[in-house]
Amino acid sequence: FNVYSPDQKASGPYATAIANWMQYIRQGKAPFITGDGEQRRDMLNVQDAVLANLFAMNHEKNFDGAAFDVGTGTNISLNEVRDIVKEYFPDVEFDYTEPRKGDVMYTKADTKSLKELGWKTTIPIKQGIQECFYNLKEKKPC
């Protein structure tokens, strides 16, 4: 799943579209979307990723090495993320490029196990993305 942060670096194999787009906007360049933008991603704010780990670490139940999906349990298309960005940067034009070979078109965390234990995300996808680009527009530290 895609963990994002307003301070995430846009380099490296795990950089999210959000981090890349923020960097391009800072540089006055057009952000790009690979493919048609209908890829759907479960995007999790880094604060929620940390809280989920702390929750599991401090939970009374012994998990015996069980794996849990940590995400929002919902997803958003890259085109929908683009629309949120354009709320803050209406003049930014996005370029579309060829799809990446092997790109996954749909991700969504199965959050049932964590929900049964009482954990849930605190930052909805749209709100977290809005905060990233609001801070970028206002040139506020994140």
Where are these regions (language model features)?
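Flexible, glycine-rich beta-alpha linker
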Residues: 1-15
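Short, conserved glycine- and acidic-residue-centered signature motifs
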Residues: 14, 18, 107
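C-terminal substrate-binding subdomain of Rossmann-fold SDR/epimerase-dehydratase oxidoreductases
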Residues: 23-142
